[in-house]
Amino acid sequence: MNFKETVLLLGMSMVVPVTSIAQDKVEASVGADLVSGYIWRGQDLGGVSIQPSLSVAYKGFSLGAWGSAGIESADTKELDLTLGYSTGGFSISVTDYWFNGGPGYFHYGTHHTSHVFEAQIGYDFGPLAVNWYTNFAGADGVNKDGDRAYSSYISLAAPFKLAGLDWTAEIGATPWANDFYNVSADPECSGSDGFAVCDISLGASKEIKITDSFSVPAFAKVTVNPRTEGAYFVFGLSF
């Protein structure tokens, strides 16, 4: 996610934790998404991008890396590291987001860093998943008084099946004033003065059969941001 306007589309398992059952053996996964646009929490973070992921998990604990690199040289490069734990429907995690274009990777100064540190807690009830995210350190935004905003985001996501596709309807909001989310070129629509709904989305996924033994997962997602008045439609393939 771009720390100013981060938007991941449907393929970002780093940002929306999924329920997992504790296993007695180490499990690992590697993959990548190719997306037509990088949209994260109602924010436009870039155009066509490749987004690789790598993770290991053991007995409910997980450590993962996720990145994004746009095909345009001007697009921000991103590297996210997430340490999490889940049991049943409950999940908790800490993510370190880093973006190029600013201070180098090993700069962790309070006021001189390109890292953003975020804590997440959530519960997946099955028909509805609820997740809360708060920035607690790094290059967070500020509130109307110029103080650290502890910028936060809450999302409600409901999965369902329809016409042979797997769907997810989601709504997300920022609960208080900050300038971290909802960045817009229009100053009247940029930032949040208080509670603001910033992501209303509907996504669907299916597997596209290539051969009798090989298929490629595909997904599409429509997102609107009432705060910035932005609207996006993204398509992606997972490998």
State where each predicted segment sits.
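Short loop/turn motifs that connect adjacent beta-strands in outer-membrane beta-barrel proteins
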Residues: 22-27, 160-169, 205-218
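Transmembrane beta-strand segments that form the barrel wall of outer-membrane beta-barrel proteins
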Residues: 30-38, 60-71, 91-104, 128-138, ...
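Detector for outer-membrane/organellar transmembrane beta-barrel domains
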Residues: 110-187
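Outer-membrane beta-barrel translocator domains and adjoining extracellular loop/strand segments
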Residues: 42-47, 74-80, 103-110, 139-147, ...
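Outer-membrane beta-barrel initiation region
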Residues: 23-57
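Outer-membrane beta-barrel "beta-signal"
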Residues: 202, 208, 228-239
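Cleavable N-terminal export/targeting peptides
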Residues: 1-27
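Residues that define the transmembrane beta-barrel architecture of outer-membrane proteins
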Residues: 24-26, 46-50, 75-79, 113-117, ...
